[in-house]
Every structure is written in C-alpha cells, then in structure tokens.
C-alpha cells in the first residue's frame, strides 16, 4: 500500500468514476421476507453471488487493473489467490486483453484451478500455502515487471468494492443499518467510506467470523496484527492479518464490529 493515503473525498471520487460496470453488473437487493417478518423489520440481501465470478471481488480487481498505464498493461498482472480474487483478476485481464498470471498453492482443488483457467487466467501452481504462493507472485512480479494486484489493501481495489455502497444507497432509501462481512477489510472499508460521507446516520457494521476476527484484534491493539490461528470454516473471510489502509478506514468509518459464531453463520 502506498504511503500516500487518499482522503475521504478522493475515495468518493474514485468510487463515483469507477469503470467496474464494464465487466460487473448492478446486483439486486433481495427482500428476505421470512426474516423480515420474524424481526419486524425490512431486511434485504445484496446478491453479489450473481456477478460473473459469483463474488464482489471482481469489482476491486477490475477497478485496479483498468487504471494501469499502457506500459503496465503490456507487461501483464499477477496475483496470488486460491479463491474469488483469482477469478476476478483473471476475468478482468481477459476483458481488458491483459495477461493475467494467478499463482495458486499446489493444494488448490482442481475445481478452483479450472475456474480460473476458464476465466482466462494463466495458472502457476507453487508452494503448499497461500504465503508461499504470495511470495512466489512477488518474485515473479519483480522478475518480469508484472503489476501485483492485491486482494484488499489497495486504494483502487477498495474503491472498486465501494461501488457496492453506491448501489445500496441508490437501490433502497429505507436503509438504516448495513452489515458487511470483514476478511481483509476491502469491502467493509469501501462501503463504509462511501456511505458515511453521504448518509452518516446510516450505521455501517462490520461482521467477522469468530475464527478469523482480525479486525477486532487490530482495534484492540490499535494496529493490524497477525492472528496466531485462523479457522477455515468461513474460508472466504479467513485472513490472518488485515491491511493497513483497510484498517485505517474501518477504524474511522465503521460504527461497530460484531463477531459471529460458526453456528450463527449457518443459521
């Protein structure tokens, strides 16, 4: 992450001008009628699973890659991921006609490898863990001049995810609370920095899994920390350490952070 941190106004500009809709779609809000009736409230679900890669991760990846210079585009991009970020980078590269290399651990299931290849990514299998794959992606980036696309701790990635906040406010004027899952913090940071500038009375609440509550630990320590253990039960948010910039924004703009158990996730 660059030492020059965009201010709130710059994030607002980045979100409003984001080109993510060249590849992503405006996803609907689905009313959860049974839950709404049970709680006596209006509860809606943002259907990011309807994106081409079945995840919001496409937004941040595309926003980052679309902003690269012609020289950077010519050399290509690289990312380390065994999940949704991998597919987001692969599809973004294919859409923009940019070579996208995805480094994945050798333990990655074939179904995930095949999904990245179908999206147009060039898969490199390396190491037995994400950390080893990430180290290899950094080595290859330095060796070949590829641009490394971070999964969350990057202003352009954060702004891409923040387009969800823009859609939420445009789609439902009755919103009083927005609950956002937290892994590395990119989605929560982007949504919160947008919503709190335009409608500060809307509460934005981060939600963490009990086995990977890196934001709660960071808030207690006053800075991001490495978790000793990370549960893979909710593998999409299983992050050992959140980003510096995502922490800064979450600390400043989230109204609250709650931790949910595995049973509550399944409920």
What are the residue ranges of the model-derived segments?
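PLP-dependent amino-acid enzyme catalytic core
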Residues: 1-267
């Amino acid at each position: 992450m660059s030492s020059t941190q965009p201010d709130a106004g710059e994030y607002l500009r980045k979100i409003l001008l984001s080109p993510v809709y060249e590849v992503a779609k405006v996803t609907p809000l689905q009313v959860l009628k049974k839950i709404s009736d049970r709680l006596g409230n209006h509860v809606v679900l943002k259907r990011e699973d309807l994106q081409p890669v079945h995840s919001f991760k496409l937004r941040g990846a595309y926003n980052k890659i679309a902003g690269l210079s012609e020289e950077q585009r010519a050399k290509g991009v690289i990312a380390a991921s065994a999940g949704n970020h991998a597919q987001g980078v692969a599809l973004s590269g294919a859409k923009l006609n940019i070579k996208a290399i995805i480094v994945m651990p050798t333990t990655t299931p074939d179904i995930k490898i095949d999904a990245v290849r179908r999206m147009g990514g060039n898969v490199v299998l390396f190491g037995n863990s994400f950390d080893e794959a990430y180290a290899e992606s950094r080595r290859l980036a330095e060796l070949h001049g590829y641009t490394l696309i971070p999964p969350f701790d990057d202003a352009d990635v954060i702004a891409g995810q923040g387009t969800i906040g823009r859609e939420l406010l445009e789609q439902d004027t009755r919103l009083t609370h927005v609950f956002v899952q937290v892994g590395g913090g990119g989605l929560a940071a982007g949504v919160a920095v947008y919503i709190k500038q335009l409608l500060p009375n809307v509460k934005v609440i981060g939600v963490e899994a009990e086995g990977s509550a890196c934001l709660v630990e960071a808030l207690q320590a006053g800075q991001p920390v490495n978790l000793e253990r990370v549960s893979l039960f909710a593998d999409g948010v299983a992050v050992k350490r959140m980003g510096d910039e995502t922490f800064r924004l979450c600390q400043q703009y989230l109204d609250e952070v709650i931790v949910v158990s595995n049973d509550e996730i399944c409920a």
